[in-house]
Amino acid sequence: VRLPTEFYQRVRADLRQRLDAAEIDGVLVTHPADVAYLMGFFYAVTERPVYLWFGTTPGGDFCVVPHLDVEYAAAQQVDIDLVAYPEFPGVVSAEQHLAEALTVRGLAGARIGYTTGVSVATLDSWQQLLHGSTFEPFTGIAAMRAIKHPEEIYFHEQAAEVCDDMLRAGRALIEDAWRREQTLPTEGEIARHVITFGTEEMYRRFDHVIFTTKLAGGLVYAGPNAARPHGLPSSRRLQAGDTLILSLGAAAASRFVESERTFILGEPSDQQRRYFEVTATAQRVGTDAMRAGRTCAEANQICLDVIRDGGLGEHIRHRQGHGIGLQNHEGPWLDDGDDTVLAPGMFLSCEPGVYVPGHGGYRISDSVLVTEGAPRRLTAYPRSLEENVIA
């Protein structure tokens, strides 16, 4: 699984233009997702740093990597010069190798951009080793990643299919136990089952799997536990009458997708119907609000106002959604505090929720592509109450 060379050429040309516009000589990249985006290098993240230098001069780019990753980078057809350092912390540090590589390329006094997420300690070490250089934040890569290319959308589509199948696998596990009159599974058992299913499906579809964090994952919570939006799966066993949230994700070529559904175990009560329908309406209205030209804050308000108007505002615990890409959570953010204007090619979750302490939670999430026209859901698992009753 590797995006075509043309993709990386296009991305790098865009980045050089942004560097020129910012009047800086280059950018130091440290985040694994940014490294993967610019050079197609996916690696196991440890204490050993990886530093990518990308400059305005073609041919001068390089990546500082631990020696143990050199062959693996070559196997991924990385076409940027590698500067290997022996080990961490090393007699000569990775930062010293970086400074030397910049110096021999005549960049010791360069204007250097750095991406968000760089630690204070790392930035301080760069400044001490490169006295003549100036450093300033650079957000251009985040802006680039927010707009998905067609090659990326293809892998998001593949991940969406797997993610929907993970929901089916989780439901089937519960239904099978119920049909056989066996003990219902625990939250943890369901989580293990769907994650294993999703991971195996990725290996079945692709001959060489690459990822920045994981191939498949998920949160599973039922009954009162479902009132905690990001609670971890527990050993609690499902019971008739429970509300169950399957919050699942998958990634193809490290392009993520999430698909989340709320299920009712047995005949829904009037209370469950009300909570579910308000959530489903907010999700439908919120998805339609994700149109090019509207701000993230405006879409968020339109979505969550459905819950407030339904008399359930006190049970809101989070924003409408977030960007998805090489990370499961990335900008832009569908939140009151983000005035980013939605644009075609942006890919975000729409996941409003209602959480009632002591009772349960309700959340429906799709991964949505912003287009020139109507928003496009890539995830397609059924959303209605009738289709999500397990009986």
Question: Where do the protein language model's features map onto the residues?
Answer:
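Active-site neighborhoods and metal-handling regions in enzymes and metal-associated proteins
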Residues: 1-391
